[in-house]
Regions:
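Amphipathic alpha-helical dimerization/coiled-coil segments
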Residues: 1-6, 24, 78-112
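A cross-family signal for key residues in well-ordered alpha-helices
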Residues: 12, 21-24, 55, 61, ...
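Alpha-helical residues within the helix-turn-helix
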Residues: 24, 38, 49, 55-56
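Short glycine/proline-centered loop/turn elements that form peptide/ligand docking sites
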Residues: 29, 46-48, 53
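N-terminal helix-turn-helix DNA-binding core of bacterial DNA-binding proteins
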Residues: 2-43, 68-79
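Beta-hairpin "wing" of winged helix-turn-helix
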Residues: 55-66, 72-73
Length: 112
């Protein structure tokens, strides 16, 4: 799934330290809102709000288990972010080389 296919902006969603902490906690497995709230310095309603935003951004999915909901990382959304970053990072050495060449050309001209 390409990054633009996600309904929300995953980078905006990851801009908040509490949401990043939730993502880190979910890396270890499925958790309920209560389990997440026990690990974080925020209330259960705040955790729920953050999870809604992460879900809208395609980074988190949920499922019902009995009377509670369990949250997990959404593999497709995480893969889309990873693919995007790999594409951007893969171009970085070429861009750096071009920048270095342009800088040295300008420096050489300025020295004359």
């Amino acid at each position: 799934m390409p990054l633009h296919a996600l309904s929300g902006d995953p980078f905006d969603a990851l801009g908040d330290p509490n949401r990043r902490a939730i993502v880190e906690l979910l890396r270890t497995g499925d958790r309920s809102v209560s389990e997440l709230a026990e690990e974080l310095p925020i209330s259960r309603p705040a955790v729920s709000r953050h999870l809604r935003l992460l879900k809208r951004a395609g980074l988190v999915a949920d499922r019902a288990e009995g009377t509670r909901r369990l949250y997990r990382l959404d593999d497709e959304g995480i893969a889309a972010v990873r693919e995007y970053l790999e594409d951007v990072w893969g171009e970085a050495p070429t861009r750096f080389r071009l920048l270095a060449e342009n800088t040295s050309e300008r420096t050489g001209r300025d020295a004359r």
